[in-house]
Amino acid sequence: MKKILIVDDEKPISDIIKFNMTKEGYEVVTAFNGREALEQFEAEQPDIIILDLMLPEIDGLEVAKTIRKTSSVPILMLSAKDSEFDKVIGLELGADDYVTKPFSNRELQARVKALLRRSQPMPVDGQEADSKPQPIQIGDLEIVPDAYVAKKYGEELDLTHREFELLYHLASHTGQVITREHLLETVWGYDYFGDVRTVDVTVRRLREKIEDTPSRPEYILTRRGVGYYMRNNA
């Protein structure tokens, strides 16, 4: 049974989410401020965190930033603010996805399922689920899918699940330009609720970790107005 940590200082909202998630078969633990969130995270080791942006004591952005120092657990951020700035900051600090309040149970369930599904290594297109995926070497970048590890110059990179999945998908289709919409559907696991800005932010975050000079990328390149691709001979 997958365990969800719900962090929201508004108890009615927390109770509704808990009820719906429990009904879907998840184990649920709750926290009502940032300090409790960090304590519950350490004690319960959840499979996914639903994290409100506005929290007392320690805000959601700081909670996400702290958790990301030691864990790549999927984080779904909730926000009453519908500003692009808050969404981008949340993603850059390590959140995997966001939902703007008010939201429907259907939307939240879809996002949680997508994050949990994508938090496990997936076979590349056409590969049998029970076969062992082979490592991919592109220049000085090595991707080991069965270990969920990426290395640069032999040193392991600190990637979140989402960043790894995006890198792995692009590396599995070197030279092929992939649209933001396709990446959103394939890597994030949904196409109806998503925002392509999420892809752009994650690509930028990934470049900062794998590129020697992120402003002049050698691995993940942009085809303006279309999408992204992994260079064949980076």
Curated annotation (Swiss-Prot):
Subunit composition and interactions: Monomer. Homodimer.
Pfam families attached to this UniProt entry: Response_reg, Trans_reg_C
Domain of life: Bacteria
Main subcellular localisation: cytoplasm
Compartments where found: Cytoplasm
Record keywords, A-Z: Cytoplasm, DNA-binding, Phosphoprotein, Transcription, Transcription regulation, Two-component regulatory system
Record-linked PROSITE patterns: OMPR_PHOB, RESPONSE_REGULATORY
Protein modification: Phosphorylated by WalK; can also be dephosphorylated by WalK.
Protein's name in the database: Transcriptional regulatory protein WalR
Modified residues (4-aspartylphosphate): 52
Protein's job: Member of the two-component regulatory system WalK/WalR that regulates genes involved in cell wall metabolism. Binds to the promoter region of the transcription factor fabT gene in the fabTH-acp operon in vitro. Inhibits transcription of fabT, probably acting in an unphosphorylated form, thereby playing a role in the regulation of fatty acid biosynthesis. Essential for normal growth in vitro. Required for maintaining normal cellular morphology, acting, at least in part, by regulating peptidoglycan hydrolase pcsB.
One GO CC term on file: membrane
One Gene Ontology MF term: phosphorelay response regulator activity
Biological source species: Streptococcus pneumoniae serotype 4 (strain ATCC BAA-334 / TIGR4)
Disulfide bonds: none
Residues annotated to bind DNA: 133-232
Coiled coil, from the record: none
Other comment: Part of a walR-walK-walJ operon.
UniProt-listed CDD domains: REC_OmpR_YycF-like, trans_reg_C
Limits of the Response regulatory domain: 3-116
Record field: transmembrane: none
InterPro entries, per the entry: CheY-like_superfamily, OmpR/PhoB-type_DNA-bd, Resp_reg_WalR, Sig_transdc_resp-reg_C-effctor, Sig_transdc_resp-reg_receiver, WalR-like, WH-like_DNA-bd_sf
GO aspect biological process, one term: fatty acid biosynthetic process
Gene for this chain: walR
